[in-house]
Amino acid sequence: MDQSDIRSAFFVECEDLMEALNEGLDRIEDTLDDGHDDETVNAVFRAVHSIKGGAGAFKLDALVRFAHQFETTLDALRAGRVSADPPLLALLHKAADRLSDLLQAARTGSETATIDPDDLVAQLAQAAGEEEAGEADAEDLGFVPMRLDLDLPAAAPDEGQSGCYSIDFSPTRALYACGNDTSILFRVLSDLGRMEVRLDRSRLPDFDALDWQESWLDWHLTLETDEPEHQIDEVFEFVEDLCRLEIRPMAMEAPRTDPDPEPDPEPDPPASGPAAAKKSPAEDHRTSSPRATVRVELDRVDRLINIVGELVINQAMLSQCVQDEGVPPRSPVRNRLDDFRNLAREIQESVMAIRAQAIKPLFQRMSRIAREASEISQKQIRLVTEGESTEVDKTVIERLADPLTHMIRNAVDHGIEPADRRLHLGKPPVGLITLTAAHRSGRVLIEIKDDGAGINRPRVLEIAQGKGLVAQDAQLTEEEIDGLLFMPGFSTASVVSDLSGRGVGMDVVKSAIESLGGRITIASDPGVGTTFTISLPLTLAVLDGMVVDVGGQTMVVPVSAIVETLRPRPADIHVLGSGDQVVAIRGSLVPIVDCGSIFGFRAPVRSYEESVLLLVETARQKLCALVVDTIHDQRQVVIKGLENGYGRIPGVAAATILGDGRIALIIAPEEAVDIGTSGGTFSMEF
């Protein structure tokens, strides 16, 4: 592993550390009224300390200097020199955001000059009760190797010295990975009194079997001190979960000055003694350490997913061959083929789970967005997240960041009222935004809910009419007015600000979500609040599809979009004055879109008696009926993108390979409905 690989591993590790940092700050904030938990503060301190240690190894001076002051303020908090209150928590959140910016700049190699941490450094120093950090602090930040002569006592013991301790210390690889240095621990211990250090290398294997990433050395320490035992505990406070540690009080005995060349065998524990041995939670580091994980490049996972996808296609082709050969249903070949199909699907689901990632990091990023928007708008905001453990395809999470950012800013800017206005309305001064994620019916639902003013529909309609988006005499339903928010260039902001008013808004959000195979809907109650609901597929690699025939072509419709299938009666079909056809379903008139016609496969169908209608739900038209000729079956298909070879095809989401080797296009129901209801067609040559 070369330097660049180690550097990359450090920044990947920083992602987890930043997640722990933000999670800890949120937990402290949530328990502010009950008093913060010391262990939570310690966890936050450890995260910043580990980032600082790694940054120092790579000479990231700006990052080290900022992390040092951040760490100092956290140390003052855990030591009780400062108390946790809302202003301090707001400052710590800002510091975490700035630390994230510095990490990102260092990771990408971009200039850090545009990120000025000095203002926050001064604020952190002031919060810690210190003078502003200056040039004199530079020596504190240096990472210059030094030789420690630990066999020499740090100071002569006092006359009243009365304690002697045996310490067995075995660091794990995780201890070093977090940027800790055993020599620093030993130096702090030596400050407590006279100490003897013996190195045990008996676990060190032969060179051929040596794993350089593993920790093979054990240390046996003897400490004579007049300090209480808890002072020794505090030295190991931040590494006790990363090592095997045992501290035993001993009978008073001066430590030897000449260590043995080889370590003595560990003595049997006495039958009785003044105190029982004290062991750390990580005494057995193999069982108490976090679950072992392996970091794998995303490209490798994608290649594996593609191979498994080909395996599924191969299994479908084999099934088709067996069917064409007329093999009896309950024959041994069929049974083995069923086993193959089940195994292939299980492998596929397991591989897809590798790409699955908890949505928590994205929600934590939204907390930062909400804080920034709150500061810019001068509104009091509280963001609550639920369902952070919900797992979604990593690609979906990455592409959701921009839409969610815009929606959170919109909720702050347009939804939540100023504090004085909220008090006048009988609401609490702090506006509430709730961000929720959950699995439902094979999809992921994300809700962005605020308790603000709701959508001012008369104002929205007035703006749309003023921009010429709808006719002046148009009579629209509430749902149709809400849909105007998704039209390109629409904005209710009268002044351009850092948050909104530039005319690039919800239409971009809608397009981004639809590109993921998702839908977005609105529910708003004036004076109560607004809820945006995003429905997304679990993965972008496979989908459950209904295989249909359209004008002699085989196509696939996502099952997640289908509400109902039916064969209409002639009496249920009606023609409107505009010439458009609708079907009457349980008292409602549902628009009809002929897939064969809009894709140019054939002329429009005049009678739908022999056709099948697929009722699909869309954001714009709600229910709409897609006309197909026949339904073949329902199956899981592997998604193959078309953009690289053919570009964007209206009404088509992607393609797949069927069991007989044919290529079938996957219909994008939302786009197909838009094309059909607007009177458009799109011709495709085969």
From Swiss-Prot:
InterPro entries: Bact_Chemotaxis_CheA (IPR051315), CheA-like_dim (IPR004105), CheA-like_homodim_sf (IPR037006), CheW-like_dom_sf (IPR036061), CheW-lke_dom (IPR002545), HATPase_C_sf (IPR036890), His_kinase_dom (IPR005467), HisK_dim/P_sf (IPR036097). SMART domains: CheW, H-kinase_dim, HATPase_c, HPT. Residues 542-678 form the CheW-like domain. Keywords: ATP-binding, Chemotaxis, Cytoplasm, Kinase, Nucleotide-binding, Phosphoprotein, Transferase, Two-component regulatory system. GO terms for cellular component: cytoplasm. Residues 253-293 are annotated as: Disordered. Residues 290-540 form the Histidine kinase domain. Pfam families: CheW, H-kinase_dim, HATPase_c, Hpt. Residues 1-106 form the HPt domain. Its EC number is 2.7.13.3. The keyword Phosphoprotein applies. The modification Phosphohistidine is found at H49. One of its GO terms (molecular function) is phosphorelay sensor kinase activity. GO terms for biological process: chemotaxis. It is found in: Cytoplasm. It catalyses: ATP + protein L-histidine = ADP + protein N-phospho-L-histidine. Involved in the transmission of sensory signals from the chemoreceptors to the flagellar motors. CheA is autophosphorylated; it can transfer its phosphate group to either CheB or CheY. This is Chemotaxis protein CheA. It comes from Cereibacter sphaeroides.
